[in-house]
Amino acid sequence: MKFLCVLLLLLSPAREAHYFPNIVYGQILIGAGTSRYETVFTLVAARETRATLGVFTDKGEPMNASFVDAQGRPAGTGSSFECYLVADRPVQIRLALAPDDAGDDVAVKTGWATIQSSAELEISAVVRITTPDGKLLTRHVLASQKPPIGE
């Protein structure tokens, strides 16, 4: 299934595709608070364009997530999120648990993501782990890779 999804990305006409093989988001209850895991994407385009972020399970199935903006406001829920980019203005998208999963004490989702656009994008991606009071515990930079072929 993962191969088929990536193959469809490659066959899309004039679309730039970025592949991130390891994403994580969720929460773990620790004592009186909850540690949060989030993957944060920052997208920048040289010209106006649309971009689509898709998230998938390790088996290649669409994965449900909440997409949150830089101010922490929910921007959408589902397995994909489309946004409009203005030239040279960064857009930040954070992955968070969907409302159905947010009530669990331990809920951590892992998988992979793609970002597609008809224009060239600069993308940075990091996984952040924070304490219940919001302090940063660790941060890992994610590199975009070429989509796998023949997996």
Name each model feature, range by range.
Residues 1-4, 136:
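Short amphipathic alpha-helical segments that mediate assembly, nucleic-acid/protein binding
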